[in-house]
Amino acid sequence: EKRESPWGTTQLEQKKGLEFDEKEYDLIDKFSKEQNIEWFASAWDVKSLEFLDKYKLKNQKIASAMITNEEFISEVAKRKIHTYISTGMSNPENIEKAVRIFRNEKCSFTLMHSVSTYPTKEKDLNLINIIKLREKYQTEVGYSGHEAAPGPSIFAAALGASCIERHITLDRSMYGSDQSASLERQGLLILVDTVRKLPIIIGNERTGIYEFELPIADKLRYWQ
């Protein structure tokens, strides 16, 4: 298939232009260790999975495209590394099979509610699935968002998503199919800052008048 890209006019040329080689993964690994960051990646085949083994990662991820490949996800589960399983483009049966494989292998996992369109329209996000998946499988459920703004990811966290995954970019106008579904720096800062404040914003189940409300009540309720 012919296509125009900064790296050439074929799919293969674009793939080669975008993919990291081993040296670049080594740099990611080195930098992440220096910054005390636990990095990980999504393998899309067994060879790539074996390549990632050398880094002794503590987490791994199954992309939405791979959730129906039972042979592959069995290989992932056998590694006994905590795995984030994206559920885009899948039906309940697909998710059920993946969960069964991981539980049979006694491999811990987090389901990631996701909708695989780029960017995803707000009307298609269906964030209620975060609650439904958590109730059905009694496991942690996160959110892998592809919308253009930070708001829905904040709502996902408020619904109890245990983790948030987002694509990030320096500039959404840059070339690439994922750019329009990514957050720029300011959007990422808003997302992170607000999610960290959520426990304070949501609060607790306390009811009654706050002490700091009393002076206002005295001022406004003249009949007291």
Question: Where would I find each of the regions flagged by the language model?
Answer:
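Catalytic cores and adjacent flexible loops of soluble metabolic enzymes
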Residues: 1-224
